[in-house]
Amino acid sequence: MARQKIDYGIDLGTTNSAIARLENGEIKIIKSNDGQMDTTPSVVHINRAKTNFIGLKAFNQIDADAKKALKEFQNKGIDSGSNTFFEFKRTMGTDKKYLCPNIGKEFLSEELSAEVLKKLKSYVLDETIQSAVITVPAKFRQNQLNATQKAAELAGFVYCELLQEPIAASIAYGLDVQNMKGFWLVFDFGGGTFDAALMKVDDGIMKVVDTEGDNNLGGKNIDYAIVDHLFIPELKQKFQLNNVMKNDLGQHLLRDVLKKYAEEAKIELSLNESASPYADDLGFDDGGNELILEMEIGIEQYEKVISPIFQRAIDISLKLLERNNLQGSFLETILLVGGPTFSQTLRRMLKLQICSNIETSIDPMTAVAKGAALFAATKDIPPNQQKRDTAKVQLTLKYPETTVETEEKLGLLVNRNYSSKSVSGKIFAEILRNDNAWSSGKIEIVDDAEIFSLLLNPSKSNCFTITLFDEKGNMLPCEPSEFTVIQGLKVANATLPYNIGIDLFDPSMGKIGVYTLKGLEKNTSLPAKGKGIFKTQKDIRPGNRNDQLKIEIYECGYKEDGSKKILNELINLVIISGEELPQFLPANSDIEIVLEIDTSRRITFSAYFPYLDETVDLEVPEQRQAEFNADELNTEIIRAKESLFNLETDAILVDYSEIAKMESELSEIAILLENGKGDYNTKTQVMERLREIFKRIDQINEENEWPTIEDELNWLLERMKNNNQRYGNDKTKKQAEQFELQAKEVSRQMNIKIAKELMEQIRSFNFTLVRDDIGFWINYIRDFDNNFSTHEWTSTSRARTLLDDAKQIISTNPSKMKIEEIVRELFTLIPEKEKAAISENDDSTLMR
């Protein structure tokens, strides 16, 4: 029977992957064809004969390939590369390329991921899979999601939906739990990523409340911590390693060789009190002695090294709970997902710091794939991609795929016109639950439409078979002939893990920042639509490609409106030029931006120009993350340390314990960078963590800006009072009193942004009051004259002539009108770049 539902769920993991499907109401993990394992190593190896090996056979090549590369470096000082690739999920959506020397070809991460997907597809022998639900970390960035979709396309999937991994795990867990209620935490610590998801069940409906995570935190970090803090110090103590360790490539290759043995020790110490790693055939040291790693690691020694990594994941989880006004004691349970969660160390830390009730009844290695398959069983394959057998009677079914009720309705419609085989006369149908414990009985389908009552087994996937009969009792083949209703759980839609915003110039703040689009706030249910009306800053001439509006789309953090662009993740840059517009668009025109995001977080963009009554629909171009430079990252670490020092010495409103904590984290980041400067993922992780520190530094600086802002606001109010007494009237007096009331409220809130907006209004009001006073304009002339050389006039001679004329008028026959005209013309002679520098603005950016 051709499938109408997707049915297949795939966990495309950093370290291991798995595939599952729903069969007769039960979730089945489809085992590998090389060892009958539930999971498949996410590893690709290509030999000299250009044959691809994926999974276990490829995994077995990692050690030999790494040792060969290290020896080539030791003997010849060259990088011979590797023909075995793993953990490439961490570089999805980046410009990272993996060179395969055996075939002289480079691969992007999505191309390697596609090979893993093809391998998983090959396990299914009874049909060809064309659709699947593929899971992704909740905190995956847009470029990573795009790369995952691309991998599915390269693997031959015609249709693919993406599902967040914590949701998939929750579905697998939730179906086995009776009377679910309250909050629980999904703690998904995988091989390469970490997600914390706060879930809640209300009346059987499960939804994501909030998420947090780190796309560069996982089992790989533990492996390298063991290498850097246990293995390499041990080798340095016994051998001379200067030649290898002083070279970035040599250090990188040695770490890669030792990683396998670190992983083995990690697994052993998950359950035992000690481990005895042994590795030989590592080449030679500087003195020609054979390198051999042989040591004993006790649990205390191990925990000292890896606890900070687990602690970071726990801190992220605690931050998530605090943000939602919850404590660990409020949780029903913690659901563990991912191989590293087998660790006795981690489980003990979780019980002590978050919640003692840890759920271990489901397999952390397969929970995501099983949940994805359950989810896939509720999702339709698009009708234009379904393969229908029109020789069978075609049916349309309407029913709830998931429910918390034990009785539901099925709507059944017979589509006689869609069947190539003629069907006449009455048609009867019987609906049979697959456990044979319930049947609808044979019921006539009157006027080709009927509603059936269904009785469901609780907390199970209920699979039903449809059988059609003609008036004589002959069976009529039909399609679809099966459907499934999952009882006991109803899953709300996935949510946005980030705010989605665009860069805008804020005239009140005098700078460009990233602002969230209304409707695309973090934790908004998908699909979602965000829109906002903004202003253009310059003229756009039709047909002119150089006249451009640039809209940068960003993923940004929680409550971070107005933050610097560099501190947010750029998704895409959309450019609208004069080539897209049919008529002239003047500056200060309205533009309505609309972003729509579907359940797989695919984005569509449109811009409406009311002045032209024109809508521009554009594809959101793909954006790849570039590799970060280790030296530049080190410079940023130094800059962050200097900023913290300045806060300690200069800031008035500062929590010194928080400063100390950030200083400690910077030291940790510096060590991380030093040990992994040759590793792509390590540098990405360093940049992500630096961003968080710089965001907090900016917030503290803004908080400390208030005393200065308050002084300036009070000065403006005093000036306004004086000007109003001298030039005002009853009407302006009321306006001034209103400003004073607003200023009191702003001061009470200590709101810097609103204060700056109010100050701009007061300045404008002051200008209105004094503009009729000739002394006001004379002061401008004197200021321009005294600071003439500091301005880069567009015409120095014209500016000089105007000032000389003004001084002549002032000394002989003062005229307010003439002086004002000269001042306004002088302002036009100030160059645009000088104005832009003053306001930190780019006129191709939209304005709030």
What positions do the PLM features span?
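Phosphate-binding loop and its immediate beta->loop->alpha context
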Residues: 25-164, 218-275, 287, 501-537, ...
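Glycine-rich phosphate-binding loop of actin/hexokinase-like ATP-binding domains
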Residues: 29-37, 176-232, 432-450, 462, ...
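Acidic low-complexity intrinsically disordered segments
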Residues: 4, 158, 290-299, 303, ...
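Gly/Thr-rich phosphate-binding beta-strand-loop-beta motif of the actin/hexokinase/Hsp70
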Residues: 2-27, 177-209, 336, 422-424, ...
